[in-house]
């Protein structure tokens, strides 16, 4: 369901300022499915999920983590930073 983590300047700024991680997911995935998958895979709690379809036809999800979890810490644990 989760295809990859987006690592762009905007994605890193969102992780730092708004505690959000940015993912590319399957087009058929619902917000609830995305939230459950992120919670299961990364052992964090999700507060909110926003999605959009990019001009390239990919589905992008902005996943806001609860205050107990830090998006930058998660990205560094995953080896993205």
From Swiss-Prot:
Keywords of this entry:
Ribonucleoprotein, Ribosomal protein, RNA-binding, rRNA-binding
State the source organism's domain of life.
Archaea
UniProt keyword rRNA-binding present: yes
Give the record's GO CC terms. Answer: cytosolic large ribosomal subunit
- Which is an annotated GO molecular function term of this record? structural constituent of ribosome
Cysteines paired by S-S bonds: none
User: What biological-process terms (Gene Ontology) are attached?
Assistant: translation
Q: What PROSITE patterns does its record include?
A: RIBOSOMAL_L23
Q: How does it assemble?
A: Part of the 50S ribosomal subunit. Contacts protein L29.
For this chain, the family text in UniProt reads: Belongs to the universal ribosomal protein uL23 family.
Q: What does this protein do?
A: Binds to 23S rRNA. One of the proteins that surrounds the polypeptide exit tunnel on the outside of the ribosome.
Q: Which NCBIfam families match?
A: PRK14548.1, uL23_arch
Record-given protein name: Large ribosomal subunit protein uL23
Q: Which gene encodes it?
A: rpl23
